[in-house]
C-alpha cells in the first residue's frame, strides 16, 4: 500500500491489511507467538501475570505508537502490534482468572462489557466504527484499543 490520500481529503489510506487467506495464516501465527510469549514470561520465567501484563502493555504501547505514527501500512509494524495484543491478552486474561480469582466466565463478561463500551464510545465519537480502514488517528486508536480488549476476551473464552 502506498502513502496516497483517499479522495483527496488528506485522509491516509487504510493501514490495516485486507482480510485474505494470507491474513488468517499470519494471524494464527501471530496469536501462537503471542500466547507462547505471554506464557513464557508469566510462567516459565515466573514473573507472574501482573508483572508480565505490565511488561507486555509497555511493549504494546511502544509498538502501537509506531503503528499510529506511520504514514502508511507497514506489515512488520502492524503484525508486531498484533503480537503485542495477544501477549497482553494472554497474561491479562490469566491475571483476571487466576490472580484475581474471577474465573473465565466473570472475566469474559467484564471484557465483553468493555468491548461493547469501547465500540459505543467509538461510534458516538466518530459517527461510525471503521474496522476495515483506519483513516484517522482517532479511528486507529479505537481500532487498536478494541483489538487489545477483544484479544483478551478471546483468550478468556478460549481458556
Predicted segment positions?
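Membrane-water interface at transmembrane helix exits
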Residues: 38-42, 93-101, 158-159
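Short, hydrophobic transmembrane alpha-helix segments
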Residues: 37-46, 69-70
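C-terminal ends of transmembrane helices
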Residues: 8-12, 61-76, 119-135
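Short, Lys/Arg-rich, polar N-terminal cytosolic tail immediately upstream
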Residues: 1-16
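Structural signature of hydrophobic alpha-helical transmembrane segments
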Residues: 44-58, 101-115, 157
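Surface-exposed interaction/gating patches
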Residues: 129, 133-159
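Cytoplasmic-side transmembrane-helix entry/capping segments in multi-pass membrane proteins
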Residues: 74-84, 107-110, 132-143
Amino acid at each position: 500500500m502506498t502513502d496516497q490520500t483517499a479522495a483527496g481529503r488528506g485522509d491516509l489510506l487504510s493501514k490495516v491489511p485486507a482480510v485474505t487467506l494470507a491474513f488468517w495464516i499470519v494471524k494464527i501465527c501471530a496469536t501462537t507467538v503471542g500466547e507462547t510469549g505471554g506464557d513464557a514470561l508469566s510462567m516459565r520465567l515466573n514473573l507472574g501475570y501482573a508483572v508480565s501484563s505490565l511488561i507486555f502493555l509497555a511493549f504494546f504501547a511502544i509498538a502501537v505508537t509506531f503503528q499510529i505514527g506511520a504514514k502508511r501500512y507497514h506489515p512488520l509494524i502492524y503484525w508486531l502490534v498484533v503480537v503485542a495484543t495477544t501477549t497482553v491478552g494472554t497474561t491479562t486474561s490469566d491475571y483476571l482468572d487466576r490472580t484475581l480469582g474471577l474465573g473465565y466466565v466473570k472475566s469474559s463478561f467484564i471484557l465483553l462489557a468493555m468491548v461493547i463500551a469501547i465500540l459505543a464510545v467509538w461510534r458516538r465519537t466518530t459517527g461510525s466504527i471503521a474496522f476495515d480502514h483506519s483513516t484517522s488517528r482517532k479511528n486507529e486508536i479505537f481500532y487498536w484499543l478494541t483489538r487489545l480488549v477483544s484479544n483478551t476476551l478471546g483468550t478468556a473464552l478460549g481458556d
